[in-house]
Amino acid sequence: MLKLLSSTTMVAGMAFATVATAQEGPYAPYAGTTLVVNFPAHPHYNAVLEVLPEFTAQTGIEVEVDMLPYLDMRERQTLELTLDEGAYDLISYVVFSKADYVFADQIHNLAPFFMNPRLVDPNYDPEDLIDGYLQNIGVAGGEKGYLPGPTGSLFGLPFGSETSVMYYRTDVFEELGLEPAQDYATLLDQACAIPAAMPGMGGVASRAASGHQASHAFLLHLAPLGGRVFDDTWNPTINSAEGVAAAEALKTIVDCGPEGSSAFGPSEAANAFAQGQAAMFIDSIAFAAGFEDESRSTVAGNVGWASHPAGVRAASQTGGFGLAIPRNAEHPEAAFLLMQWLTSKQGDLAVALAGGNPSRFSTYANAELNAKFPWSATFGEALADADPDWRPIIPAWGRINADIGTTMSQVLTEDLDIQEALDGIAERTRALMTEEGYYIWQ
């Protein structure tokens, strides 16, 4: 049974300039349609709920939302997308699901929708979409199979996309005479020096729980420290010197972090920072608003924002969520209209003003947004370093990701030798890639 929240019962968000009504114009054929959408329980999509009533008011299209924790959402979609008649007209998907859904032909190529003059808004301005997000979230079939290129196609639009930034306690840094780290040497020094100077205070709060969270945490450091999971011919390079440095960095951060760090997911790590248990937090831009909410955060008013520190290169995370239309959707054209509306300039700004993550350059440049959320300018600048090849979004990634996550947890909690751990991952990954056919042409 779906848990459905009708958009007509939610609090209305900011008003839009009406471009069409349900009685006339492009939305008229779809007035009275009810779309069922699947969204994650996530700060961005909480903001979306506030603006959905305006979509219904403008278009006459009702929206019912099935909201689930994002890993549970992935499990539900894995089932629904295989059915002849699915429950969902529009889905939000985690970035690493892109390869699976495209490879299984479970989501629509968006070209036919953007070619239809009855559907596409001539003022949509796709060039304003943040290109790193669009490449990472939406494009498949190009370079390496998951990046843009001459053979690539668009299957989704970024919505709730994220990059990584560093949050830090301005009061703690001022008291200790520190500046926010711009490089990894300084970051790792501060991560352990701060707890030594202020007993009871962790250095960096980080996700590290066994499985996906430990893998994600490792990847946060692998890219800036110069590493990749594979080279350009799919040879595993995770066990390179750069991979070892990334694992060592994560272990240092967890060892010098707040109590219980090795079991933290992103919410637990963010909460540790919000409750004053850590001086830094390196993770998604999605957490910023919560740190300034005095009802949930003891550090409100004492939080600074900086770009993800650089190693041998500046390479922050690209990830988060996108929107796609399932192949088995009952109302694909109306779903496209909702997708287009939410990711339009007006829609993106409305969601951002409600606390969501912008997907457009123009939104980050908006004066009203920057006045309301002063961290927006820093986050906009950080996008220059967002790495669309931050992780390999291939069909085999789910199994590789799980292996990295469980093995990295052993490094963090059982002191498994780092080189031995990474060599094991590389060996198992090569066997998997052989099985998947990646070396058959070599």
Regions found by a protein language model. Name each.
Residues 31, 303-307, 353-406, 410, ...:
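Long, aromatic- and glycine/proline-rich binding clefts that accommodate carbohydrate-like moieties
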Residues 138-159, 164, 185-235, 278:
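Extracytoplasmic/periplasmic solute-binding protein
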Residues 189-195, 232-262, 304, 308:
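Glycine-centered hinge/linker elements that transmit conformational signals in sensory
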Residues 31-42, 61-66, 89-90, 155:
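Short, well-ordered beta-strand elements
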